Amino acid sequence: MCKGITRREFLRISIICIVLFLILGTGLAKPQVTYGQTTNLRFSTWHVPVGYEVKTVWTPMLEELKKKSKDRINYTMFAGGALGKGPEHFDIVSKGLSDIGYFTATWTPGRFPLTDVLSLAAWVDGKDIATDIGNAMYKRILNQEFPGVKMVELNGCIQAFMWTKKPVRTLEDVKGLRIRSPGGHQTNYIKALGAEPIFMPLGDVYLAMETGTIDGIVTCPPLIMSFKLHEVAKHAVVTTFGCVSEGVIMNQDSWKKTPDDLKPVVDEVCHNPFHTTGGLTRDVYKKMMKEVTDKKVELYNLPAKEAERWYDRFRDVTRKWVADLEGKGLKAKEVVRAYNEECEKRGVKVAAFPPEWK
């Protein structure tokens, strides 16, 4: 027996050591699970406060979180440029300026190279469908591009059209036009058609079209309405240019701090916010297109033969994009094939998919 320690003290210390060893050794020492706490989520998006997205998707989604959590989740909305410009929104969340928010991957070229597959030219007429496809692609392959954040949902967008000041009917009409591009594949599609892609913030497009600095824009119908571009772009070619790759992410530390019993609520409500809220779904898209025509915008559907001329060029863009990425060691063709599979499962046609890759 050690000098100065009684037999009873020795036994007590021994028992404590054995218990600690069993707890640590069997992995029973886990972080304390948090229940019953409340949290306030700072939500950020570049979408304008009065636009379709904020009014019909983000605010209703956050209200649903509040309701489902029985008021234990509250929120603060930061819309438009409140926290930063559009391309900054991934970092706004990842660096903790906000807790959760919407970002556009296409606006940071080269950062999420494979995720650009979601912006290939495809006939997607609802963001609910785009999100189902994006989430499936994230699970299959794209998760590798987003370390360090909690991916809430990943999506492409509703198909973009070309909106112009003057009528466009053929490839020849497009040649030489200056067209605002959102970036990514759309930039290369515009080039492939013989036009000049111009990149500028959406908020600057109205004046640029009004003054003739640009001749048109490639974007989706919701943004035409949100930014009132229907007032300056009175003609649209209804043929898919695809659109941008986007999603909702959550700051990793904010996710860890979220009470454990509220995490399933966040997943349930936000994994497909368009399903949850009914905003920007296929049904809404149909109504939105009627709103566009009610604003006296002429929608021109390309005849099948002319559309194929455009799509042949889009497919060449896909082939080159894949070749460039595979030259860097990325399995781009595999990703494109997977995307086409996920689209076909949901009745979506990828116009830019090279048929020989089936």
Predicted regions span which residues?
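N-terminal secretory/targeting leader peptides
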Residues: C2-I23, P31-I129, Q144-K358
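Signature of the catalytic double-stranded beta-helix
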Residues: D132-Q144
